[in-house]
Regions:
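N-terminal Rossmann-like FAD-binding beta1-loop-alpha1 element of flavoenzymes
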Residues: 7-33
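Redox-cofactor binding/interface segments in oxidoreductases and associated redox assembly factors
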Residues: 10, 169, 314
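Glycine-rich FAD pyrophosphate-binding loop
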Residues: 24-49
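N-terminal FAD cofactor-binding segment of flavoenzymes
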Residues: 43-89
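Short beta-strand to alpha-helix junction loop
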Residues: 102-122, 260-262
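Predominantly flavin-linked oxidoreductase catalytic cores and closely associated redox partners
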Residues: 126-273, 277, 337
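FAD/FMN-dependent oxidoreductases across multiple families
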Residues: 233-235, 241-243, 255-379
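C-terminal helical "tail/cap" subdomain of flavin- and related membrane-associated enzymes
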Residues: 343-612, 617
Length: 638
């Protein structure tokens, strides 16, 4: 008799284990088995890459999977992303730095994958999931009708078959189902990587040892806990701390600029490459033997389909992988797993339709993945331009917080409407124009860095978007706020366009720079020959003042004016003083315990209301809206 389950998950990596936990939490009556070739204990540190999370994945791990306490106790907090630009052969402390000074109110984490996956296996087993270890999945035979699918397995020399109503491919880059069904899809993002783990704390702060107290103090928390990036044209090098005490180090390159063959064959070759391009990193690493050494050439790929109404899906790297720069891997796991659970739920309720599954594939593959690839594809040439990459990073974060993360936080991914698809397409089209603008800008403008340290938390628009992730909204409220955010991003795109024109085509700048023409942001480019045919000067939106958004990039493109110093820099400096410059140990304690470990909605309500405005909402605001036993004030976006 072949054992039969409601859900068979092939692969007990991060995607498979988190899916098993999510199914058990949301659909506890279902029987689940997880199959993996590796048996416990898995090695800590030297196990798998993919250690850093951003807000969407952190929400998934912490809130959806109910792992906040575990992550606080067994993993490390993440102090955002940090980038170092400029002359890699000069003094490290003189390199322009982009990174936050304090933890945000929404936690993110540095994950030791070996520790996490060991712990998750134990957790799901205790929840009633059957964890079948030391077992290889040979084939997946999909049923043509309502019969169970069959998974043919092998343990040692013994072969056996398992049956499941649902089967999930979480086998990683093996991509068993995608290969079987002809669903693999290249995406022409030619990038490669090599990485290793060192069994010691490697602190980038030690590279700036000659920077003195001022360099050390400008970041209140410990740089060590950031995902640290050393940036150069066509490459970046990462340093990520792990809870086991080890440090993950990696080299990632554009194949057309730094071929994999120049660094990826061995640890010795990688060290030689570091010595040539990032000597400060080489000095930090050279005395250690690695716990492991891994590499991937041309790591990026897509898929034609990852969900099916015939009761299968591909999650994690079994479906797609884009690029590690902004740690999107766990974000896609969160979205794919949540959609998979929704499909399973509807199936057992008799409500799953082929049309709904088509929408899920369209959402992830045609919109989210297609648009996210634009952050990385052909963009590695920008990394040598501190001011352009800083502008790009702020833009990327704004798009992510304004729409992508909100899709998940507001649970829209489970039931995307036509209006959601329409809005996503508008975001995607605008993002495509701006990303190409950055690429062309970097190709035409000289590299420069008007700043010593930039911190996106000084950008008020981004502050509002980040705080806004703490609000919970209805579907209509989500749509209205997403539209308002799109308006703000349209204004940012106009400012970026005119800055690029000023640097690359100064003869095209209007005489009066204080009143820039309002253009069609969906038609911007650095090719004047296309402006007429693309309708650059025929915007479909009414002119709005750009002044409120102008200070977003204060100090990034040029030293701050006196007005900006008073209006932007002075409040930021006072804010820093109140949170760390004067008494760093006390402020760190208060910040972590009063802000980071709590939703901090009291702080958010100082800036943002919780729902958008409509006539009915406006009337309700006067009296307050009662939700869940609490009275909350008002509505509106940013």
């Amino acid at each position: 008799m072949e054992p039969e389950y409601d859900v068979l998950i092939c692969g007990a990596g991060l995607a498979g284990l988190t899916l098993a936990r999510q199914v058990k939490l949301e659909l506890p009556a279902l029987s689940i088995a997880v199959i993996d070739r590796l048996a416990r204990p898995l090695p800590e540190a030297a196990h798998k890459v993919g250690e850093s999370t951003v807000e969407l994945a952190a929400c998934y791990f912490g809130k959806v999977l109910r792992l906040e306490g575990y992550l606080t106790q067994r993993q490390l907090p993440k102090l955002g992303l940090r980038f170092f630009f400029g002359n890699a052969h000069g003094s490290f402390e003189e390199r322009p730095e982009l990174g936050v000074s304090l933890y945000g109110i929404l936690p993110t984490y540095q994950l030791d994958r070996g520790r996490l996956e060991n712990d998750l296996r134990q957790m799901v087993a205790e929840m009633g999931v059957e964890v079948i270890e030391g077992t290889t999945v040979d084939t997946i035979d999909l049923a043509d009708d309502a019969d169970p699918h069959k998974v043919r397995c092998r343990r040692d020399s013994q072969q056996f078959t398992l049956r499941g109503r649902w089967v999930i491919d979480a086998l990683g880059r093996r991509r068993l189902l995608a290969s079987k069904l002809g669903l693999r899809l290249p995406n022409n993002h030619s990038a490669s990587a090599a990485w290793w783990r060192i069994d010691s704390r490697l602190d980038v702060g030690e590279m700036g040892v000659n920077g003195g107290a001022q360099w050390q103090r400008r970041v209140i928390e410990d740089r060590y806990l950031s995902t640290n990036h050393l940036m150069g044209r066509g490459y970046w090098v990462w340093f990520i701390p792990l809870a086991s005490g080890a440090t993950s180090v990696g080299i990632v390159t554009d194949e057309t600029i730094h071929p994999f063959a120049t660094y990826g064959k061995s640890y010795a070759q990688a060290l030689a490459w570091l010595r040539a391009y990032e000597p400060a990193a080489w000095q930090l690493v050279k005395g250690y033997e690695p716990l492991d050494f891994r590499h991937l050439k041309n790591y990026s790929y897509n898929a034609r389909q990852i969900f099916s109404h015939r009761r299968w899906s591909c999650v994690g790297e079994a479906g797609l992988f884009l690029d590690p720069l902004y740690s999107p891997g766990s974000d896609f796991i969160a979205v794919e797993n949540t959609i998979t659970v929704e499909m399973i739920r509807r199936d057992f309720q008799g409500e799953l339709t082929e049309g709904a599954v088509d929408d899920f594939n369209r959402l992830v593959l045609d919109l989210l993945a297609f648009d996210a690839l634009r952050y990385f594809k052909d963009a590695y040439s920008i990394f040598g331009h501190a001011h352009i990459f800083t502008a790009k990073h702020a833009w990327d974060v704004a798009i992510y917080w304004a729409m992508i993360a909100q899709l998940f936080v507001q649970d829209v991914v489970r039931r995307p409407s036509r209006d959601v698809f329409t809005l996503l397409r508008q975001y995607e089209d605008l993002n495509a124009r701006v990303q190409q603008l950055f690429i062309d800008w970097a190709a035409a403008a000289p590299a420069r860095a008007p700043f010593a340290h930039a911190d996106i938390t000084r950008m008020r628009f981004l502050q509002m978007l980040h705080l806004d992730l703490a609000a919970r909204r209805s579907h209509e409220q989500f749509l209205n706020v997403a539209r308002k955010n799109l308006n703000r991003l349209e204004e940012v795109a106009q400012l970026l366009f005119w800055q690029a024109i000023a640097e690359c085509l100064p003869e095209r700048m209007p005489p009066d720079r204080s009143r820039l023409p309002w253009v069609n942001a969906w038609s911007i480019s650095l090719n004047p020959e296309l402006w007429e045919t693309d309708g650059l000067y025929k915007p479909s939106t009414a002119r709005r003042s750009l002044r409120p958004m102008r200070d977003m990039y204060a100090g990034v493109f040029a030293p701050m004016t006196l007005r900006q110093l008073v209006q932007v820099e002075l409040p930021y400096r006072i804010w820093l003083a109140g949170r760390g410059k004067l008494v760093p140990p006390l402020v760190r304690f208060l910040h972590r315990h009063l802000i980071c470990d709590r939703p901090a909605m009291w702080l958010r309500r100082l800036f943002i209301a919780d729902s958008p405005s409509s006539p009915a909402d406006a009337r309700a605001r006067g009296n307050g809206l009662r939700r869940g036993g609490r009275v909350t004030k008002g509505t509106g976006g940013i």
